Amino acid sequence: MLRRLTANIFDFLLVLIIIFSIISIIPQSKNAENISKELNTYIEKNLFTLKGEERNQAIDLAYSLDRETTYLYVVAALVMIVYFIFIPKYLKGKTLGKYFRKIKLVNEDISEVNYNTLTYRALLNTGLFIIILLPFFVYICNAFWYFNITLILMALQLLFWLISAIILIIKKKSLVDYLTKTKIIEVKR
């Protein structure tokens, strides 16, 4: 279980580094920069203590910034798809974290996982589902609904991770393993 945990931490940190590295070289529009600066004034006040009109203005600014920078969701989604779907398929069930920890993902019958299984796992386990959905919601919802949908989706993802961690501790197999009929095994070199 420790190998799996350290592999997952390594993978998520690496993906975050890749995403932020790519995003940092993409120039922001002037409008996005202005919105970001204005939003930072609210963040400095602590978003969770804002009330009334100030809170609504902060939500509107965050919504406007997300509309202005939806390309960032595309970058994040593409990196996650490559890292959590294509790389494990190419490396026969291993991400870089799993490779270094000498473990790999297989179907319950020990056969190699396919793209459908890897996609399903990535959508459930990495937040990819949310990253794909939010750019659509930002254009079909107003700021209020977008903010609430975002919070609900994030809470559901956190709940999924919590339930999965509890099941993993008790049963030595995570919720996503049960849902995708997969397991993690040690690799002998």
Mark where each language-model region is.
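Short, small/hydrophobic-residue-rich motifs at membrane-helix boundaries and re-entrant hairpins
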Residues: M1-F136, I140, T150-R189
